Structures are given as structure tokens and as C-alpha cells.
Amino acid sequence: MSSTIFGEQLPKYSRVEYVGDVPIVEECPRDVKTINGEPPLLFGKWSFENVVVRDPGLRRYICLKPVVLPHTEGRYQNYRFGKARIPIVERLINLMMRPGRNAGKKHKAYNIVKRAFDIVYYKTGQNPIQVFIDAIVNTAPREEITRIIMGGIAYSVSVDVSPQRRLDLALRWITEGARACSFNNPKPIEECLADELVAAAANDPKSYAVRKREELERIAAASR
């Protein structure tokens, strides 16, 4: 296999998978093992085994590659659909680095997510990775609206949402809900994030992300 693609040097020990005609670079196989032969545990605690994505449309875009430290150093940013190969927990960590005053503070965001997963386990007794995946599935919208212009008049029409955008919106709303909960609130943000994940996984309307999904789908249904 060539070590370049589109004239760009690939990372060492990488391989290329193709989605149609689109090359997707993956640095190492998904069945990577540690020295003792066991799959890596997220944060040294949580197993990726038996984690199920119940929405078939999202399975292809949720990366559940076993990792201890979810940090890819931006190596997929220059590849089309590269974020489909970023561990899904890292995408959550990256979105916790907003707004601008938190930009670049990845270690802080990492600790927030790590503590939030501990709280999720204490509250539910379930694998927090599975709770997180269920939260994504329950908050990913299936319809949204777009504006079209016909005869000089703008109309709002309902359209289906692509799987990648469904995932992007779900992650955005989950992190927005955690920040909104912790604003002017003595409750720490990791506890707010844990509450948001638990509520979203249960499809509870108390979840900010669930309410946003229902609102968007209601507007889209009225625009059919």
C-alpha cells in the first residue's frame, strides 16, 4: 500500500479504508490489544465491549475503537469524513472546550468528562459508555428544516438529516445542556453533564438535548 494519498503523507502504521470512493485513514486496527491481550479500557476503567449502537444509521459514524486516552492530536482533520474515525468520547471532550474562554483547555475538559462518567456509573450502575451512546441515539434528530426560494418567496421545508449531522447536533446539544445547567449554579459542570447524559439516555424531557430534538422535529413536521 502506498504511504501517500492525494499527495499527502500518511501517519506511520496507518491503513486506508474506503467508503465508496472516499478514502478514510485509520492509524491502527480497531481490534487493537494491549500487552496482556486485553482490550484497552477507557480512562483505565470502562470497557468498550458489548457497547451497542441501537440506531443503524449512526453505527457507521460512531467510533467505538478501544482507547485508554481519547486524544488523536487532530490527525484526521484534513481528511473528508475524518471525524467518523475520531473516538466518540474525544468528540465529547472537544465540544466541552467551548465557549472561547475554554478553548485549548483539553486537560480540563478531559477531567470533566472523566468525572462525569464516574458519576453516571454511581447513579445508574451501567457502563457510562453505553449510557453516552444511548443519549446520542435519543437526541439525534431525524428531520430538520431548510429554506428554499421559489418565485422570490422563501419557504421553510422539512428535510431528512444526514447521519453525520445527526451525530453533530446530538453532541452539541448534550454539551450545551451541561453548560446551561452549570451557569450561575453551584452544581459542578461534571455533575451537570452526568445528569444530562442520564436524562437523555432515558429519553426524559428534562434533558435539554431531548427538548431541542423534539422542538426541531415538531417544527419540521409542521413544515412538510
From Swiss-Prot:
Q: Which CDD domains match?
A: uS7_Eukaryote
Indicate yes or no for the key word RNA-binding.
Answer: yes
Provide an example Pfam family for this protein. Answer: Ribosomal_S7
Keywords from the UniProt entry: Ribonucleoprotein, Ribosomal protein, RNA-binding, rRNA-binding
Q: Name one GO biological process term.
A: translation
Q: Does the keyword Ribonucleoprotein apply?
A: yes
Question: For this protein, what is any one GO molecular function term?
Answer: structural constituent of ribosome
Single GO cellular component annotation?
small ribosomal subunit
* Domain of life where this protein originates: Archaea
Q: How does it assemble?
A: Part of the 30S ribosomal subunit.
Q: Which HAMAP family match?
A: Ribosomal_uS7_A
Name the record gives this protein: Small ribosomal subunit protein uS7
> Which organism's genome codes for this protein?
Pyrobaculum neutrophilum (strain DSM 2338 / JCM 9278 / NBRC 100436 / V24Sta) (Thermoproteus neutrophilus)
User: Taxonomy-wise, where does this protein's organism fall, top ranks first?
Assistant: Archaea, Thermoproteota, Thermoprotei, Thermoproteales, Thermoproteaceae
